[in-house]
């Protein structure tokens, strides 16, 4: 029963700190310090200093600010406008019309951003006014944008996959490559839903189709070519083993700066604002990660993760039941915490359980990110809902209801990934073979 008491103690103190308005990172450090002072004889100060320094000086973590900066640079370019202009001629004849621009546009921007909120904001900045002008139904317009924006967490480069990789000491390159096929699969599921919805509600869909010759389509899409080359360069360099995730991130930043320069959107103000935005985001994430690592150390000293893993093992839960319980747990947790906090707060306890159950940690990372994606469109703390609320001038309840079908489709995606784990594992296996 000791492990149950310790679990309740840690959770209670953490919730108290969080409820008091203390920063997430400071809350985790505070819980860790109290736990070590009460239940171990280890010196708290030395352990905290060593752990936080070790986490902050991690070479693997270097990829984080670089990928964040790449997204910040491109967020300030004409990419939003180019995405709509380049994709709309190809999408308009599909059932669902230009709604597909939301899905494909989010998938493309996700491949250079790594942030769900930035993906929604960038694509929505152009698509919302354009689709409203063409009288597309608000429900499918906002729902598709909210759901598709979550691809920013899964399709590489993904900030949350970097954090997960650092937390469980798994290869970030493998995690990035593992997210490609599930990300494309979810995008296809969303597009299929848009097609079915539009066929059922065909009376509500606009009938206007702008005519383009094939050469006009190619010309309008040409503006997306530099972005596609940048995406292929970053992901391709990781897959072929030419570059590590950190080196690929450096390549991405240089490419983003060059692209921004030639689009005439790079000046001293945009350079400074992108750098400042990346610094703020990266410092916040690194601080949370440092607190999480110290919490993991403190729990390790108390023996809590090991004892919980043994306790779970003695319950004789089947692996699928454990995964189902964790899915419900993370959905509920995601209703109150952002995705990054949900991951770093729980990995110290969850990781031993997953390893004990025999799951591949690369596969579990993809599973976890998809579930955390679902939380991005669930109230009351669904970040994508807040972003859309500000852009669309609709109440939170309406946007959440519009996004709910996409939430159910993501549940379907989780089931598919659980039943067919090779969807996430095949590409990393091929990558290892190519490198060797």
Kindly give the residue locations of the regions a language model identified:
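Alpha-helical transmembrane segments of multi-pass membrane transport proteins
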Residues: 1-436
